[in-house]
């Protein structure tokens, strides 16, 4: 259910784009992300840092898209967000000694520290590659193809990555 909740702004962006175009879709994404943060704050009294970062990036890049009437800003937003996630994962681990992947998943999985470190680097690399892939699609395909990639391509890549990661992790999990 959380996965669908996380996709809420992207799905609304996709639908709004198909019906009204990029600029209305951008406004819808900003409002949807604001609503998402408000709901999480109301429901849980705490909003994850990643969601705050997502909100900041969509407001800045979406706002620039609307004010300057230039769709490139909203198209760059996923790359900036993915690269911030990648940098955040690596900086937290190597500058501050905190493995954010372990912090998020440590209650569900018991893994040795070197495995957590590999997982952290794998996620950072995954986000870095997604950022590059987004730029490639932005500059080599139509706006409509980019919107399809944004919803289906990146979501599909995420699902495949999680499945592969799960298969890799099975060798480290003990029978409980």
Curated annotation (Swiss-Prot):
Signal peptide positions (record): none
Family matches, as InterPro entries: YciB
Superkingdom to which the source organism belongs: Bacteria
Protein keywords: Cell inner membrane, Cell membrane, Membrane, Transmembrane, Transmembrane helix
Main location per the UniProt record: membrane
One Pfam short name: IspA
Subcellular compartments: Cell inner membrane
Cellular component aspect of the GO annotation: plasma membrane
Membrane topology: Multi-pass membrane protein
Transmembrane segments: 3-23, 24-44, 49-69, 72-92, 121-141, 149-169
Family: Belongs to the YciB family.
Job of this protein: Plays a role in cell envelope biogenesis, maintenance of cell envelope integrity and membrane homeostasis.
Designated name of the protein: Inner membrane-spanning protein YciB
